[in-house]
Design a protein with these regions (language model features):
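Surface-exposed loop/edge segments in extracytoplasmic proteins
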Residues: 73-81, 218-227, 266-267
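Short, compositionally biased P/S/T/A/G/V-rich stretches that sit at domain boundaries
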Residues: 31-37, 147-197, 278-288
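Short amphipathic, basic-aromatic surface patches that mediate peripheral association
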Residues: 48-59, 190-205
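Short, surface-exposed loop/turn segments at beta-strand-coil junctions that are enriched for proline
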Residues: 242-249
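Aromatic sugar-binding surface patches on proteins
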Residues: 88-113, 232-242
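Short acidic/polar inter-strand loop motif in beta-rich domains
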Residues: 120-140, 260-269
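Bacterial N-terminal signal peptides
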Residues: 11-20
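Short coil-to-beta strand junction motifs in C2/discoidin
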Residues: 59-66, 202-212
Length: 288
């Protein structure tokens, strides 16, 4: 009988272990109620900064830049406006080493375009910039396609759009000024980055790395190429030339100045047309 009693005791203990214990039960977690504002529009700030390649921000000195943000799916313009402000901190942008994640253009106040959009879902947009607006002949355009996510602001440096080129302007002779055949004339041109910074020897924008030259055209034909040299005046480069004969240029000539830096990808052209006269005209007499 002893073994039977032992077996019964073991069965009782086993049943107690396996029996459910209601007092120790863990209630199931309740799901949280849905967020009633989940589909509400969320204000999303986008900052766009237009800069000149290898240079500063396009600020008020060069007329700034126009920025347009367009919804890719619908083609609808979401925002448009002007970038205005200063060109930025030259020492920080051009001379100070920095890590990739460190702000470059926003360490000090600089020109930017800022807008806030009410977004309910992620959208893909084209952000386009055109400038410098004060120099239409040198104006460039650039576009970048990105995603915008509701509630995720793009600030600090923001979306940086880079324009390539130079502002090249013929300063002398003045565009449209009549030229006298066979006269010895000095061609002068100024060269600046698209942000308005001066291009000159030994500067942050070193003209020694840039091929700067002039051309004389009759019609579409180049009749002479001129190597231009720094004149010592701000952003000034010059080269002398002789005005062609009237019989060779009855419709006048075109003067062209070119700045080319293949290493950086920056190029700029300035040109103007001039009538050619066969002789000097006497000054007009003023009526008494």
């Amino acid at each position: 009988m002893k073994p039977v009693g032992t077996t019964l005791r073991l069965l009782v203990l086993l049943s107690l272990v396996l029996a459910p214990l209601p007092s120790l039960g863990i209630p199931a977690e309740e799901e949280p109620p849905p967020d009633p504002h989940l589909n509400d529009p969320k204000p999303t700030t986008i900052l766009v900064r237009v800069v000149a390649h290898g240079s500063m921000v396009l600020g008020k000195e060069v007329g700034g830049a126009r920025v347009t943000i367009t919804d890719v799916a619908s083609g609808r313009i979401l925002a448009t406006g002007l970038q205005q402000g200063e060109a930025g901190d030259q020492n920080q942008i051009m001379r100070t080493p920095h890590l990739m994640e460190e702000p470059l253009y926003s360490s000090r106040a600089s020109a930017a375009f800022t807008t806030t959009l009410e977004l309910t879902h992620p959208i893909q947009v084209d952000i386009e910039a055109e400038g410098p607006l004060a120099y239409p002949a040198s104006s460039q355009r650039v576009s970048k396609r990105i995603w915008l996510i509701p509630g995720h602001d793009l600030t600090n440096d923001g979306i940086v759009l880079t324009l390539y080129g130079y502002i090249v302007q013929i300063e002398h002779p003045k565009p449209g000024q009549p030229l006298i055949a066979k006269d010895d004339v000095m061609l002068r041109a100024s060269v600046r980055t698209l942000s308005g910074a001066l291009v000159r020897p030994h500067g942050d924008w070193d003209s020694r790395k840039v091929h700067i030259y002039g051309e004389i055209l009759i019609g579409d034909r180049i009749v002479e190429r001129l190597q231009m040299f720094y004149s010592g005046e701000k952003a000034g480069f010059e080269a002398p030339f002789f005005v062609p004969l009237l019989k060779d240029a009855p419709d006048g000539i075109t003067l062209r100045a070119v700045a080319a830096d293949p290493a950086s990808g920056n190029f700029g052209v300035g040109q103007a047309k001039y009538p050619v006269l066969s002789e000097r005209l006497p000054p007009r007499r003023r009526d008494p």
